[in-house]
Amino acid sequence: MTNKAAKIAKQWLDDADAILVTASNGLSISEGLNLFANDKKLKEVLGDLVDKYHLPNLLTALVFKYPNQLDYWRMVARVVEYYGNNYEISNYMQDIKKIIGNKSYFVWTSNIDHHFALVGLTNLFEIEGNWFEGVCSNHPAEHSVHYLASKLHEIYEKDQAGTLTEADIPKCDECGAPLALNMAGEDFQINQKQVQAFQDFIQKYEDKKLVVLELGIGPRNQMIKAPSM
């Protein structure tokens, strides 16, 4: 970006009535979370599961059809412990918060890491869900969504101690069926409160000075980039 372009961008941000932050996996990669990478960090996060199931990256690990629920939840707990429960705000997130300042804002993201919420940016629409939430595998639409942060930490600790059993598998409070992560797929339950809040935000600022701050979104992105053009 040239100095002239940077000055114009700063002026737009200063003059904005509100800021819409749109973000995809490029931002996550900048923070050190790369769903597509086959590197040393993959084994650091997933441990023995990498060789056991020949997992080439985190994305494959998340969608792999495990032969048992214990290994599925071992995988989930290890990923969420590393990238979620142990998350420390990055320089990128600090900069985003600084740019937003006291202005009205909303975040529209396809990232599943929940990092925006973890740093306090809770005016948020997670269009593909996040890996802290679970839904009933038998009645995903009818039964409530479960927030699993503490449960996943418990699973992680038992996994590390070698004491994890079938009794520790997260289950639906309403029917006792196993849970599944509430992320993109046929059972995904989009957060309707987030949808409504996002619609309200857009309607409120559609005729005002609304700046779109696009972060890490590829040119072919159809979920966020295309509809926001």
Predicted feature descriptions by range:
Residues 1-229:
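Conserved catalytic alpha/beta core of Sir2/sirtuin-type deacylases, generalized to analogous enzyme cores
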